[in-house]
């Protein structure tokens, strides 16, 4: 990678963020597409967010990515939001269009792109969890024409989750069904009629636990996805594969949300296959 007076910067802004794999992905992409850009990680305090966003214009950057805790806090500093960012209420990518800062959320698009030969349009989905990743998957599914969504959260989280789903219905006219994870018979019934089952919780990161009981029976054609990629195969995915179901981890979502952002910044397609190779070697 050559750096010179014309190199344009991009960065991921979060706290903590030093561990991020994003610089690895994007700098590979800049190199592979012969784009004069560089991608770094900025770990900042909340009090520096406004100044950091102002620097996108000041230094004529391509833009930035955002992770926790700044995906929502950044919104007041932007000129415009994309449809999905408005629906989700969170931004993970800011694009500098001639000094106009536009907020996007590429997480949901990235998630659906990583599913092998699967389109959500007209399909039924069961989603476990209602945090940031779940919201982006939810909103994107609605924009892409999903026919039914059942969201399962622990009963203690029901009240916290409902206002967001009500807001989604208000904005899109789409009603999402909200259920308690503890009702196993309801979970079984919803999964039995689903085309896609997604774990969007952090359960399984320990390599031990699974978000659903093992006695749940999966329909044959159900695709199972987990947003976790460390461990590479969670107990949830192992269990799905043991029933003969196709199962996908979260590494593809990470790569394809980055590819979406890269295209928004540069107008170029990220060479995802090449980078996927390096990523799987790194994490498998």
Swiss-Prot record:
Q: Where does shikimate bind?
A: 20-22, 67, 92, 107, 229
InterPro entries listed in its UniProt record: Aminoacid_DH-like_N_sf (IPR046346), NAD(P)-bd_dom_sf (IPR036291), SDH_C (IPR041121), Shikimate_DH (IPR011342), Shikimate_DH-bd_N (IPR013708), Shikimate_DH_fam (IPR022893)
The source's domain of life comes to Bacteria
UniProt cross-references to SUPFAM superfamilies, sorted A to Z: Aminoacid dehydrogenase-like, N-terminal domain, NAD(P)-binding Rossmann-fold domains
Cited CDD domains:
NAD_bind_Shikimate_DH
Q: Which UniProt keywords apply?
A: Amino-acid biosynthesis, Aromatic amino acid biosynthesis, NADP, Oxidoreductase
Q: Does the keyword Amino-acid biosynthesis apply?
A: yes
The UniProt catalytic activity note for this protein reads: shikimate + NADP(+) = 3-dehydroshikimate + NADPH + H(+)
According to the UniProt entry, what is the EC number of this protein? 1.1.1.25
| Active site positions, chain numbering | 71 (proton acceptor)
Molecular functions (GO terms):
NADP binding; shikimate 3-dehydrogenase (NADP+) activity
What Gene Ontology terms for biological process does this UniProt record contain? Answer: amino acid biosynthetic process; aromatic amino acid family biosynthetic process; chorismate biosynthetic process; shikimate metabolic process
> Does the record carry Disulfide bond as a key word?
no
Gene3D superfamilies assigned to the protein according to its UniProt record, in alphabetical order: Leucine Dehydrogenase, chain A, domain 1 (3.40.50.10860), NAD(P)-binding Rossmann-like Domain (3.40.50.720)
Q: Which family does it belong to?
A: Belongs to the shikimate dehydrogenase family.
* HAMAP family cross-referenced by the UniProt entry: Shikimate_DH_AroE
Q: What does this protein do?
A: Involved in the biosynthesis of the chorismate, which leads to the biosynthesis of aromatic amino acids. Catalyzes the reversible NADPH linked reduction of 3-dehydroshikimate (DHSA) to yield shikimate (SA).
Subunit architecture: Homodimer.
PANTHER family reported for this sequence = BIFUNCTIONAL 3-DEHYDROQUINATE DEHYDRATASE_SHIKIMATE DEHYDROGENASE, CHLOROPLASTIC (PTHR21089:SF1), SHIKIMATE DEHYDROGENASE (PTHR21089)
Q: What is this protein called?
A: Shikimate dehydrogenase (NADP(+))
As recorded in Swiss-Prot or TrEMBL, the protein's gene is named: aroE
